[in-house]
Amino acid sequence: MNWTEKPDAGYRITRMAREDLLGIARYSEIHWGKDQRNRYLKSLEKRFEWLALNPKAGRRRDDIANGYYSFPHGQHVVFYLISGQMIDIIGLLHKEMDILVYFHSRE
């Protein structure tokens, strides 16, 4: 799966979010196998496309940084920014992760 840019789908994936996706893919494959990994990654891709069409559906996360949005998906939370007619996927965190530590440790 190509996790760089999908401008035709209305979203871009930052380097940090690509690293998160790779970690999710590795973990999923080790614990649940390739088929489940592929299903979950495909469901994330569909979520990104849906968020690109419905960017305001997410929760504003100005508590983290101005302009951040989040939307839950499975065991993870998708973080993104609205950039004109597109969204930028900026991070994918497990729902149990410390959000502030995640974003501030990667600045």
Regions found by a protein language model. Give the residues of each.
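Charged, solvent-exposed alpha-helical segments that act as regulatory interaction surfaces
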Residues: 30, 34, 53-57, 98
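Enriched for short, Lys/Arg-rich terminal
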Residues: 81-107
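Gly/Ser/Thr-rich beta-alpha loop segments that engage phosphate groups in nucleotides
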Residues: 35, 60, 93
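Basic/aromatic recognition patch in beta-strand/loop cores that engages polyanionic ligands
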Residues: 45-46, 56-87
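Hydrophobic pocket/interface hotspot
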Residues: 17, 44, 89
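Conserved N-terminal glycine/acidic-rich loop preference
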Residues: 16-24, 67, 76, 100-101
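Arg/Lys-rich, positively charged N-terminal/basic patches that mediate binding to nucleic acids
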Residues: 1-41
